[in-house]
Every structure is written in structure tokens, then in C-alpha cells.
Regions:
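Residue-level recognition of tetratricopeptide repeat
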Residues: 14, 48, 82, 115, ...
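Start-of-helix register in tetratricopeptide repeats
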Residues: 7, 41, 75, 108-109, ...
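Position-specific recognition of the canonical hydrophobic site in helix A of tetratricopeptide repeat
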Residues: 17, 51, 78, 85, ...
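Canonical tetratricopeptide repeat
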Residues: 45, 79, 112, 146, ...
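Structural marker of alpha-solenoid helical repeat scaffolds
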Residues: 35, 69, 102-103, 136, ...
Length: 270
């Protein structure tokens, strides 16, 4: 019986991987590499399978082997960049991305570069990269969310609000609604900030920081009873937030002076 060739194994392994059977895909790749060591397609696919299982270092080894055997593969450079970013090796990730973009400019590579610049703390370059994506795809939600967050960190609240409102659609993650709450809070739009923080908590009920900030904006809006309920939830989720809650209660324009720390803890349910 004829042994399956590498392309046949890749097709079967890819089908298994895409059907949610990564262990089968891994076994096929490993058997294929036992027959044809160094086959770049199999190393590439095995790297993708391992990466999906968060086996970062083995995945990195296989994708680098694939590139050594078949230089100039844009898809392999993109995968190598993602794996390097996951490993925290941002310089290597950016090097792979620049090579991928040179070989075959495509949206996924530019998006991955923006993520890498952002995660590595290169804020001016990250903001520029996210903005470039928005220039081409104005409704790109991730780009709008990250550009908005960076604009807020730079003190550009007007731009931050505009882009975060674009990103804050029904299925947006809790982090986007939280960031929108921060911007609206800084703009002293407490009603909209309240709505954003509530949405963040709807998405992620254990979001202690959102509960804390919800308490602060409710307090600023003069609704101290609702603020206390939010503070109780924040304290329940994260008892370490007690100091921030106490500070907020005594420093805001609508607050209460708590001289007895134990009494405040009891009021918060502690």
C-alpha cells in the first residue's frame, strides 16, 4: 500500500484541526515528520496545532524549522510573529511581521503588528498603527477600541470617546465598555459613565474595578445609596479595594466621613 505523501497528511491534519480535533492533527503531523523529517508544511501545521494548545516553545521551534526549510513564507512568518508575541519576545515578533509584510502585505499582518507594538508598550507607534488600520477599515472594532484607549491615556478625551463609542457595540467585551466608562467619567458625563460601567459588569460580573468605578460615578452624581451598593459589590469581589472605597467616600463632593474603619467595613458587608 502506498504511504500518504506530505501534502495528503497536511490536508488530513488541517481538516482534523479545523474540525476541533487538535490531538488527531498533532498525531498526523508527528507521524508525517517521522516519515519525512524537515517537511516545512508539516512543521508549520504542527506549530499551529501546538500554539492552539498554548505549547509556546515547541510551537516556536517547529515554525522556525519550517522557515529555515522554506524561507519567504509570509504565513509562516505571521505565525512565528504570533508565537513570539505570546512568548514576550516582541523584537522577534516585529522582525517576523516586517518580513511578512514585505513578502505579502495583508490586513492580518498589519493588525498583528499593531497588537505587538501595543503590547510591548510602544505607545506612539501603536497608536499610529491602529490609526492606519482605521484609515483603511473605519469600523474595525478592535482598532477603534485600542486607539480610543491610547487616546484616553494621552489625555485626548474627545478622540477617545469618539472611537470607544464606535467600538462599544452590543457584543463588545467588558474591557471596551470599561474604557468607555473611564472616558465618560473624565468628561463628567456621569449618566453615560454609569451606563458603560453597568454594561461592563453585565458582560463580566466579577469585574471589581468596574464595580468600584460605578460606585464613584454614582456618588459623583449624588446617588449615594446606589453608590454604596456598588461599593459593597466591589468590596465583595476584591476586599483589597477597601482603601480606594474609603478614599472615594471621603474625598468626593457627595460622600460621607467614616471615622471608624470597622463601621465602614461592616457597612460594606465585611
Amino acid at each position: 500500500m502506498n504511504q500518504p505523501n506530505a501534502e495528503s497528511i497536511v490536508r488530513r491534519a488541517t481538516a482534523a484541526f479545523n474540525s476541533g480535533r487538535p490531538d488527531e492533527a498533532r498525531e498526523l503531523c508527528e507521524k508525517g515528520l517521522a516519515r519525512t523529517p524537515g517537511e516545512p508544511m508539516l512543521h508549520h501545521l504542527l506549530a499551529a496545532v501546538l500554539f492552539s494548545k498554548n505549547e509556546i516553545q515547541p510551537a516556536r521551534k517547529h515554525v522556525e524549522t519550517s522557515l529555515a526549510r522554506k524561507p519567504g513564507n509570509a504565513a509562516a512568518h505571521l505565525l512565528a510573529a504570533r508565537i513570539a508575541r505570546a512568548a514576550g519576545d516582541f523584537d522577534a515578533a516585529l522582525l517576523h511581521l516586517d518580513r511578512a509584510i514585505t513578502i505579502k502585505p495583508q490586513r492580518d499582518a498589519f493588525l498583528e503588528k499593531a497588537r505587538t507594538l501595543d503590547q510591548s508598550g510602544q505607545r506612539p507607534l501603536a497608536r499610529e498603527a491602529w490609526r492606519a488600520i482605521l484609515d483603511v477599515v473605519p469600523q474595525h472594532r478592535e482598532a477603534a477600541a485600542r486607539f480610543g484607549r491610547l487616546a484616553w491615556e494621552d489625555g485626548d478625551h474627545t478622540a477617545a470617546a469618539a472611537y470607544l463609542e464606535r467600538a462599544a457595540v452590543t457584543d463588545a467585551p467588558a474591557s471596551v465598555w470599561f474604557d468607555l466608562g473611564l472616558v465618560r467619567q473624565d468628561l463628567r458625563d456621569y449618566d453615560k459613565a454609569t451606563a458603560a460601567y453597568r454594561k461592563a459588569l453585565d458582560k463580566k460580573p466579577d469585574y471589581a474595578e468596574a464595580a468600584l468605578n460605578l460606585g464613584i460615578v454614582l456618588q459623583e452624581a449624588g446617588d449615594l445609596d446606589s453608590a454604596m451598593r456598588a461599593y459593597r459589590e466591589a468590596y465583595r469581589l476584591r476586599p483589597q479595594a477597601f482603601g480606594k472605597i474609603a478614599m472615594a467616600l471621603t474625598s468626593a463632593s457627595h460622600g460621607r466621613l467614616w471615622i471608624d474603619e470597622a463601621a465602614l467595613r461592616r457597612s460594606l458587608g465585611g
